[in-house]
A protein has these predicted regions:
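A short, charged, amphipathic alpha-helix used as a generic interaction element across diverse proteins
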Residues: 24-42
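Short, acidic, Ser/Thr-enriched surface-loop or helix-capping motifs
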Residues: 10, 25, 49
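Generic "edge-of-domain/loop-turn" microfeature
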Residues: 13, 28, 53-55
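Short, mixed-charge low-complexity intrinsically disordered segments
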Residues: 39-63
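Short acidic, gly/pro-rich beta-turn/loop elements at beta-sheet edges
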Residues: 16, 31, 56-58
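A short, exposed loop/beta-hairpin motif centered on an aromatic-Gly-Thr core
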Residues: 14-24
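Short, charged/polar surface micro-motifs in flexible loops or helix N-caps
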Residues: 14, 27, 61-63
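Short aromatic-glycine-(Arg/Gly/Cys) micro-motifs in beta-strand/loop hairpins
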Residues: 1-16
Length: 63
């Protein structure tokens, strides 16, 4: 297992929160980050990070 984190950017503009994420590799971590974004409408963007390095980011599609 590798340790990643998700930086959760709120749609309301509230200060982002960091949430730990354990995944087998970056591929699994990306899939879990996408799923996390889809689970709630609270977030406008989720960054996938390893340590201080941003690996990827996913934004919510706006209608």
């Amino acid at each position: 297992m590798s340790r990643f984190s998700l930086r959760l950017h709120y749609a309301t503009g509230r200060t982002p929160d960091d949430e730990p994420l354990d995944a087998l590799d970056e591929v699994e971590a990306r899939e879990l980050a996408r799923m996390r974004l889809l689970l709630t409408r609270d977030y406008s963007e989720i960054e996938l990070r390893r340590g201080e390095r941003r690996i990827d980011a996913f934004q919510r599609d706006h209608p």
